[in-house]
């Protein structure tokens, strides 16, 4: 399984709030869109690490995958860096020391997507 990318995974069971996919990936009901999910079938979710919830998946469209360049929207900035919208609900962090130019909220910027040391999706310029 590759984090930060689409993966073909089998649906193992239905839980209270999500479907459990092979590899321990949780696919929340609200991340399924209009796709009918059947136990035993395969789905193609985008898989990412959520620090609080563990391995998560979405069947929605994301704006880029790990190993790719992507134009992402800056939704907020802080002393740490900029938070970018990848389309997964959680924002991707572009650390200040990874910025080649200063960015501000509302900008659309070109970044490379990678995994950090905790397998979370991160951005760099």
List where the protein language model places each region.
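Single-stranded RNA-binding regions, centering on S1/OB-family and related RNA-binding modules
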Residues: 1-125
């Amino acid at each position: 399984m590759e984090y930060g990318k689409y993966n073909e995974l089998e649906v193992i069971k239905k839980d209270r709030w999500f479907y459990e996919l092979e590899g321990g990936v949780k696919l929340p009901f609200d991340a399924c869109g209009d796709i009918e999910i059947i136990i035993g079938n395969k789905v193609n979710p985008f898989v990412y690490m959520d620090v609080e919830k563990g391995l998560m998946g979405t069947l929605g469209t994301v704006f880029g995958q790990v190993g790719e360049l992507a134009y992402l929207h800056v939704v907020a900035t802080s002393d740490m860096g900029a938070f970018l919208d990848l389309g997964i609900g959680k924002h991707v962090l572009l650390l200040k020391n990874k910025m080649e130019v200063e960015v501000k909220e509302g900008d659309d910027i070109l970044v490379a997507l990678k995994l950090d040391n905790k397998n979370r999706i991160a951005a760099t310029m």
